[in-house]
C-alpha cells in the first residue's frame, strides 16, 4: 500500500451553515406568536425556528439576517433557506430571498489506518500544532483553502472549511502526509 494509490475515502458532511437576507424588517414577536416550531429569545433579540424537512435550525434577527445550520449538503441548505423564507412570507412579511451564501462546512473523514500524531506534527511543524494536554487532536491549517483539520490518532479527521469543494481538496492534500505517519499494522 502506497500513498499514491487511489483510496476511496468517505467524506461525510455533518453540518452546513449558510446565511441569507430578507431585505425587510422582521417583527420577531409576530414570528414567535404565529410561527411554527419557534423559540423567542427576547433578551438577545433573536428567534430560533426549526424546520423538519430538511432538518435545519434558523437564527432570525429583526434586521432580516438569517443564519441556517444543520443541513448535510449545500443544496439542502439552499432548499431549507428558501423554505424558511417562504414560511416568513406566509406570516405576512415582504421577504426577498437575497445574498445567500454558504459560510461554513463541517465534515468527517476516517482514514483506513491509525496515525502517529507526534511524528506527524514534527514533520509538518509550521502548519500543525499538537497540545496533548489540551486537546487529543493535531490542529492542521491550510491557509490557501481556508480550512482547519482536526486529526485524531484513530485516523478520524474533522474538517472545517468554507465550502464542500475546499473540504474535499483539503482531505486530498492531507492524505500523503498522514500516510507517512501511519501506525504499522501488526
Swiss-Prot record:
One of the record's GO cellular component terms: cytoplasm
Keyword annotations of the record: Cytoplasm, Developmental protein, DNA-binding, Nucleus, Transcription, Transcription regulation
Pfam families according to UniProt: TBP (PF00352)
Domain of life: Eukaryota
GO biological process, one term: embryo development ending in birth or egg hatching
PANTHER family named in the record: TATA-BOX BINDING PROTEIN
Identification of the protein by name: TATA box-binding protein-like 1
Gene assigned in the entry: tbpl1
Amino acid at each position: 500500500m502506497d500513498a499514491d494509490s487511489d483510496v476511496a475515502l468517505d467524506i461525510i458532511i455533518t453540518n452546513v451553515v449558510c446565511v441569507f437576507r430578507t431585505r425587510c424588517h422582521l417583527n420577531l414577536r409576530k414570528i414567535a406568536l404565529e410561527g411554527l416550531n419557534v423559540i423567542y429569545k427576547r433578551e438577545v433579540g433573536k428567534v430560533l425556528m426549526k424546520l423538519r424537512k430538511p432538518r435545519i435550525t434558523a437564527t432570525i434577527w429583526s434586521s432580516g439576517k438569517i443564519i441556517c445550520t444543520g443541513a448535510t449538503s449545500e443544496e439542502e441548505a439552499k432548499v431549507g433557506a428558501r423554505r424558511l423564507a417562504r414560511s416568513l412570507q406566509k406570516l405576512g412579511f415582504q421577504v426577498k430571498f437575497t445574498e445567500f451564501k454558504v459560510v461554513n462546512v463541517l465534515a468527517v473523514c476516517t482514514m483506513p489506518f491509525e496515525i502517529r500524531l507526534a511524528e506527524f506534527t514534527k514533520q509538518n511543524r509550521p502548519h500543525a500544532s499538537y497540545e496533548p494536554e489540551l486537546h487529543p487532536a493535531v490542529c492542521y491549517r491550510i491557509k490557501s483553502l481556508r480550512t482547519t483539520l482536526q486529526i485524531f490518532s484513530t485516523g478520524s479527521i474533522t474538517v472545517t472549511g468554507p465550502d464542500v469543494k475546499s473540504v474535499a481538496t483539503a482531505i486530498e492534500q492531507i492524505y500523503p502526509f498522514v500516510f507517512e505517519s501511519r501506525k504499522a499494522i501488526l
